[in-house]
Amino acid sequence: MSVSIRAGGSSRDVNSVVRLHRRVYAGEYGLARSFGRDVARRLAELRRGGWPGPGEGLWLAELGDSVVGSITLNRVGGGMGRLGHLVLMPEARGSGAGRRLVEQVLEAARAAAYERLELATFSDLSAAGSLYRSVGFVNVSTERTVRWGRRMEWQLYELEL
């Protein structure tokens, strides 16, 4: 069975994104429970601001009836957008779903005439970092920090469109 990509945005879809982040990042990377709460809070803040609006979106990767991945795009201002909430369950990795999700965001950002995209991640997510660099994102800063109960290298990436 192949992974399909669809646009989302319902409350149910947003809840799926939060659940995915809790499962993957707590289970695989040992992030504290506060990470899941932060994801839920961030998505709630975006929704209160009218997200997803024109030039923004949420896309889900599905395997059968199960949501196995997600990505978001939101407008920051000044021609800049933010790619966020990229996550894939282990069963979807290696299928090309991550690349397809990122390409969906790039397509939407270009169609909305964004000038630049930004994203934040941490260095343990090496496959994601490789994917971002392969489509042209550049690491503009790295900071050693403690977040969600773990020491990590927090990375900021940008892409000129």
Segment roles from a protein language model:
Residues 95:
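Flexible nucleotide-binding loop
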Residues 10-12, 115-161:
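C-terminal "cap" of GNAT-fold acetyltransferases
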Residues 3-91, 99-104, 108, 112, ...:
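Acetyl-CoA-dependent GNAT
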